[in-house]
């Protein structure tokens, strides 16, 4: 986290409290990680004295994080990435259920970004999108990559006539397989080509579209975050298997 510019570091207690309260209000998922594991959680409550974080879904992970000497927490919203570290967590209760309780961090990184890290969408089963062009024709595409800020898409046919950069689309339907179907507004940022060399040493060219999401609701944003976390975890697991 020290790789960020110091301008993104918040040390004022009121500023830190404000960021954490926004994460709590919008129920933004937290990725809690330590030397030997990670899980997804959320903030249950926060005040000037303490931060209360929900238990994870697996008991062994909850036990493991309590033994960790330092815990890193990352949250991503549509507008920024938040990162901070905490000392050893302590278990307690919130509304009669187990929870982690800790003092607020002494500092946190609040990094506003124009571009988001994009994670590759699965090749199988593929994720698909459908929207309507201004002339009422249907535009279908396959998701190539995904972030909170937008998505990359590949067309299975030629670029339709009249499709231009800057065009806006309302209620684009995204079929995310096991995650379900989502609807988002999006703007077409760029039209390009993806070129790959196949097994016959021939170049395969596929039209590629880059979209920016518009007016994403907090509920959809939370689900997108969960999908991205899951895809990141699967990518790491595949990489580990290759190394083994």
UniProtKB/Swiss-Prot annotation:
Biological process terms in GO annotation: bacterial-type flagellum-dependent cell motility; regulation of bacterial-type flagellum-dependent cell motility by regulation of motor speed
Sequence ranges assigned to domain PilZ in this UniProt record: 112-230
Predominant place of localization: other
Record-linked Pfam families: PilZ, PilZN
Domain of life: Bacteria
Entry keyword 4Fe-4S: no
Substitution effect: residue 223 to W: No localization with flagellar basal body, thus no binding to FliM
Gene3D superfamilies: Electron Transport, Fmn-binding Protein, Chain A (2.30.110.10), predicted glycosyltransferase like domains (2.40.10.220)
GO cellular component: bacterial-type flagellum basal body
Keywords: Bacterial flagellum, c-di-GMP, Nucleotide-binding
Consequence of gene loss (knockout): No visible motility phenotype. Disruption of this gene suppresses the reduced motility of a yhjH disruption, thus the double knockout is motile. Overexpression of this gene in a yhjH disruption has the converse effect, i.e. it reduces motility further.
Subunit structure: Monomer. Interacts with the flagellar basal bodies.
Record remark: domains: The N-terminal domain is involved in FliG binding, the C-terminal domain is involved in FliM binding.
Family classification: Belongs to the YcgR family.
Physiological role: Acts as a flagellar brake, regulating swimming and swarming in a bis-(3'-5') cyclic diguanylic acid (c-di-GMP)-dependent manner. Overexpression of this gene decreases swimming and swarming motility; those cells that are motile turn predominantly counterclockwise. Binds 1 c-di-GMP dimer per subunit.
Official protein name in the record: Flagellar brake protein YcgR
Natural source organism: Salmonella typhimurium (strain LT2 / SGSC1412 / ATCC 700720)
């Amino acid at each position: 986290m020290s790789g960020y510019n110091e301008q993104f570091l918040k040390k004022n207690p009121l500023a830190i409290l404000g960021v954490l309260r926004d994460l709590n209000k919008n129920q933004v998922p937290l990725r809690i990680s330590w030397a030997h594991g990670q899980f997804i959680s959320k903030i249950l409550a926060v005040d000037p004295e303490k931060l209360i974080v929900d238990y994870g879904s697996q008991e062994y992970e909850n036990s493991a994080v309590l033994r960790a000497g330092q815990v890193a927490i990352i949250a991503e919203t549509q507008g920024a990435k938040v990162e901070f570290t905490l000392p050893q967590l302590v278990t307690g209760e919130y509304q009669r259920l187990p929870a982690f309780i800790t003092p607020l961090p002494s500092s946190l990184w609040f990094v506003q970004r124009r571009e988001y890290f994009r994670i590759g969408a699965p090749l199988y089963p593929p994720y698909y999108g459908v929207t309507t062009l201004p002339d009422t024709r249907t535009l279908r595409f396959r998701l190539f990559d995904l972030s909170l800020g937008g998505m990359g898409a590949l067309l299975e046919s030629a670029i339709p006539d009249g499709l231009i950069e800057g065009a806006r689309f309302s209620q684009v339907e995204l079929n995310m397989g096991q995650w379900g179907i989502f609807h988002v507004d999006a703007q077409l940022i760029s039209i390009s080509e993806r070129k790959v060399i196949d097994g016959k040493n021939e170049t395969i060219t596929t039209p590629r579209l880059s979209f920016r999401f518009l007016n994403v609701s907090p509920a959809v944003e939370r689900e997108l975050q969960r999908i991205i976390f899951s895809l990141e975890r699967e990518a790491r697991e595949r990489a580990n298997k290759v190394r083994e």
